[in-house]
Amino acid sequence: MKKICFLTLMLITAFGLNVNAQKLTYGAHVGVNFSGYQGGDGYHLYDEKVRTGYEIGGNIGYKLGYNFILLTGLNFSQSGGRFSTMSPYISETGSQTTEFKEVNTKVLSFEIPLKIGYEFNIGHNFSIIPNAGMFARYAIASIKSNVITADDRTQKWKCTDDFNDESHHIDAFKKFDYGFVGGVDMIFSGHYSLSADYKHGLKKIQPQFGMKSWSANISVGYRF
């Protein structure tokens, strides 16, 4: 995080940001997201699935000059994923067996993005803003998470806590996550927006299986 703060300070210094002198824009958005996990131990993980969730948030923009914009805000989202795992032990026949038929996660989180965008004015009432940067996210609650064991027992579980069932164990998912974000905003009539972005976590949010988060988001909004 120190590196992120340092890079942010460098960007602000480089563009000569003067909050009092620059035009401030703000707005709100609501949309849908598709999320899951990538990476991980290929010997233990299989059948990764995408989860559908939502995102609502407020947006703040500072016009830096030369069409560059510093974009931030605060988002509230529901995201998660689904996967299956193989047992770390070898069966009597010498083959691997399933340990968890399904591991389902779903969390509610607050997120702060920090991005730099460039506004292309295509016409009098239309502009496109490609943007890229980083995000920080913190999970405040685990909801509707559960585990289906190899013997078809479904057990409720808070994925931000450890799961233990006799000799079966799943480490807790980390509450804090951060990573890269890139996307594009389309502004219509100076106020209405249609946005899409992709987020990829840099932190191993589940150390036991070495997984990182990802999500794709589509939203509509209004810019004041």
PLM feature segments, named:
Residues 20-57:
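Short glycine/proline- and aromatic-enriched beta-strand/turn motifs that initiate or cap beta-hairpins
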Residues 24, 67-70, 126, 190-196:
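Repeated loop/turn-to-beta-strand initiation elements of outer-membrane beta-barrel proteins
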Residues 24, 50-54, 106-112, 126, ...:
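Residues that define the transmembrane beta-barrel architecture of outer-membrane proteins
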Residues 28-30, 72-74, 114, 130-132, ...:
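Membrane-embedded beta-strand positions of outer-membrane beta-barrel proteins
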Residues 32-36, 76-80, 108-111, 120, ...:
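Transmembrane beta-strands of outer-membrane beta-barrel pores
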Residues 36-51, 79-109, 139-175, 209:
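Extracellular/periplasm-exposed beta-strand and loop segments of Gram-negative cell-envelope proteins
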Residues 62-66, 120-122, 188-190, 224:
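Outer-membrane beta-barrel strand-turn architecture
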